Structure formats: structure tokens, C-alpha cells
Amino acid sequence: MCMVIFAPLFAMFAFATCGGYSGGLRLSVDCVNKTESNLSIDIAFAYPFRLQQVTFEVPTCEGKEQQKLALVGDSSSSAEFFVTVAVFAFLYSLAATVVYIFFQNKYRENNRGPLIDFIVTVVFSFLWLVGSSAWAKGLSDVKVATDPKEVLLLMSACKQPSNKCMAVHSPVMSSLNTSVVFGFLNFILWAGNIWFVFKETGWHSSGQRYLSDPMEKHSSSYNQGRYNQESYGSSGGYSQQANLGPTSDEFGQQPSGPTSFNNQI
């Protein structure tokens, strides 16, 4: 039930917070010659974070010439992989929810549904772990590449002490941090569901039968042995009691009375 409710929501939050991100930073370069200054240099970037394609122009403080620069790094592979896993997990969760609710008999027919569900759950657990870890590393690279201090180091005008370079505002990464959190939450959710899906497969029930059969055989043989011992003891006891009574052959017949007394009279 938890998978039916939380799996689609967690997957949706994961790809929405990452795939829908767009942010930016603003820098200012104050040259000695004020006419050459630019106090509002906006640098925008977004998913899939191909930062090397993000270009911007800054003053050189050496006349009207502008310097064209680009950000450093490319985290598109990890970001796209993460979003792809989230989208497919979302779609599968919705499809599985429909099957659970409306096609329960078809799901359990020939045990095919639980087996497929178990395999897919294991695969998605692994993909969530790999995708979340890769995206966490990719996000760390994005933060470094878009750090205003790092970007200012790329400008030739900022290497001259007479010019003043500063960051007006930094990019907001809260939604990207949330995407990483939801990625690992999805891994915990899917990995924790492996055991519950496994119990619905035939492998779990067959394993229990395999373990219970030897125990039943051992218990039946033990009870049979006890029954034989009790039967043997009881039969022996009765035979001994039967042999304790005297027989007519051993003691003979008792005399009926003295016959010689009648003869004397």
C-alpha cells in the first residue's frame, strides 16, 4: 500500500525538482574607467546542466572590448540519467497501481505478476541507488562551476587589483538539493519493498514448504518411535502380570476332606 501511494509521488518530485530547474547568478565588474563597467552580468543555466555551453560577455576594462566566457563542466549525463529513472519509475508505479486495483486476478494468475514485479523492483532499486549517487556528484560539480567566486576567476578584468569584481547574488540550489533527497528516498522505498514483493512470489512459499517437510518427517518418525516403545512396554507388562497368577498344574488340586475319619466311625 505504501508503494501505491508514495512511489508515484516520490518519483514525480524527483524528476520535477531536477528536470524543471532553472537558475542563475549575477556578477558585477567595476572598472577604473566607469564607462567600461558592467554592474549587472547575468548568467543563466538550467537542466540538463551543459555548463560549457553557457556563455556570457564581461568587460575587460581595457576599452570597449568584451571578453566572451563560458562556464566549466558538464553534468548532463548524470542529470539526464536521474530524470530518466524517475520518469520510468513514475510510469511503472502508475501502471502497477492500476493492475493492483483493477486486475488483481490477472496479476496473480500463474504467479507471473508477482515474479515480474519482484524483478522490476530489484532493478529500480539498483537504478535509484546508482542514479541518485551519480546525480549527487553531478550536483556537487554544478555548485562548484556556478560558484560566483570561481566564475570571477575566469575574468581577466578581475585579475587586476584596480578593478572591483563582486557577486551580486548566487544561484539558489534548494530544489536541486531536494531532488537528491527524493532520489535516495526512492531508493529506500523501492529497496524496502523488495521483501514484501518477494513474499508474494512462489519462491517464498516453496522455500517454506522445503523447510517444513523434513521437520514433519522427523516429527512423525519420532512419534512413531515413541508409540512403538509404549506398545512394547505395555504388552510386556500385561504378559508379566498374566504369568504371576498360579496355575492348577503347579499347585495341584486341594484335598476335599479326610476320608479316613469316616472309615474309623
From Swiss-Prot:
GO CC annotations on file: neuron projection; synaptic vesicle membrane
Positions in the Cytoplasmic compartment: 1-4, 103-114, 199-265
Chief localisation class: membrane
Glycosylation sites recorded in the entry for this protein: 33, 38
The species this protein was found in: Mus musculus (Mouse)
Swiss-Prot/TrEMBL Sequence repeat ranges: 210-214, 222-226, 227-231, 232-236, 238-242
Name of a matching Pfam family: MARVEL
Function field: Intrinsic membrane protein of small synaptic vesicles. Probable vesicular channel protein.
Protein name: Synaptoporin
Key words, A-Z: Cytoplasmic vesicle, Glycoprotein, Membrane, Phosphoprotein, Repeat, Synapse, Synaptosome, Transmembrane, Transmembrane helix
Residues modified to Phosphoserine: 212
Family: Belongs to the synaptophysin/synaptobrevin family.
Compositionally biased tracts (Polar residues): 221-230, 240-265
Residue intervals annotated with topology Vesicular: 26-81, 136-177
Chain intervals for the UniProt region annotation (Disordered): 221-265
Domain of life of the native organism: Eukaryota
InterPro entries: Marvel, Synaptophysin/porin
Record has DNA-binding as a keyword: no
Domain (MARVEL): residue spans on this chain: 1-202
Parts of the chain that traverse the membrane: 5-25, 82-102, 115-135, 178-198
Membrane topology, record value: Multi-pass membrane protein
